Amino acid sequence: MAKDDSTVRCFQGLLIFGNVIIGMCSIALMAECIFFVSDQNSLYPLLEATNNDDIYAAAWIGMFVGICLFCLSVLGIVGIMKSNRKILLVYFILMFIVYAFEVASCITAATQRDFFTPNLFLKQMLERYQNNSPPNNDDQWKNNGVTKTWDRLMLQDNCCGVNGPSDWQKYTSAFRTENSDADYPWPRQCCVMNSLKEPLNLDACKLGVPGYYHSQGCYELISGPMNRHAWGVAWFGFAILCWTFWVLLGTMFYWSRIDY
């Protein structure tokens, strides 16, 4: 292939442009995954307690892929500009490996969205919230994390339980074992608070008088951020894979036409 041919130069330009887009998207993917794993909503303890935090694993893979794709896009640009078969061969091999990792990340993130059901968080809350009799230290750590997270959620977001205050009444729970039904029909965090973070009217809250306790459940406030992050990691990653596929295909065609 003649390197001074105008058609070749145009094709090189297209491939370079494709790799520039890959590099830019990889930075965005990395930033998105960093934001996710930084746990801005402080919900990780709830997932950790379920023993299924694969969505975070998908985000960590996405971070790794973002770094690798950026480096490989630079390598690809250099190989195309120099029309170097060896550089491009290394580019292909590494890109296929990274591509496989990103496929795994996308599939994991997409499938985990179906995992965030009300019953999952309800079962975990009933078993672990204020559970002071764990079988081992690992469970104690998880129980403490779940308790602190639920306390913060209910206070900060003015909600109670997964589906509502009735969760604490309808089901057997560690909280019910530790507290009497008359004095603690639900956690104090379910009460409407004053400026000092004290119940506005404790007796009215315990009796379930409207306006003195929070009747809304917390499920949407938990699943919403997790689903959005899982959707972003999965589908933005999938979009990058689609673009990368065509860039790789074009680069392979270009590689096959380079003179030895």
Curated annotation (Swiss-Prot):
Keywords on record: Glycoprotein, Membrane, Transmembrane, Transmembrane helix
Main localisation: membrane
Keyword Plastid: no
Domain of life: Eukaryota
GO CC, any one term: plasma membrane
UniProt note on tissues of expression: Bladder epithelium.
SUPFAM superfamilies assigned to the protein according to its UniProt record, in alphabetical order: Tetraspanin
Cytoplasmic side: 2-15, 82-86, 251-260
GO terms for MF: structural molecule activity
Extracellular side: 37-60, 108-229
Post-translational modification: N-glycosylated with high-mannose oligosaccharides.
UniProt keyword annotation of Nucleus present: no
Listed Pfam families: Tetraspanin (PF00335)
Subcellular location: Membrane
Protein topology in the membrane: Multi-pass membrane protein
InterPro entries reported for this sequence: Tetraspanin/Peripherin, Tetraspanin_animals, Tetraspanin_EC2_sf
GO biological process annotation, one example: protein localization to cell surface
Membrane-spanning intervals of the chain: 16-36, 61-81, 87-107, 230-250
Gene3D superfamilies the record matches: Tetraspanin
Reported function: Component of the asymmetric unit membrane (AUM); a highly specialized biomembrane elaborated by terminally differentiated urothelial cells. May play an important role in normal bladder epithelial physiology, possibly in regulating membrane permeability of superficial umbrella cells or in stabilizing the apical membrane through AUM/cytoskeletal interactions.
Record note on quaternary structure: Heterodimer with uroplakin-3A (UPK3A) or uroplakin-3B (UPK3B).
Family: Belongs to the tetraspanin (TM4SF) family.
Name of the featured protein: Uroplakin-1b
Organism: Bos taurus
Gene name in the database record: UPK1B
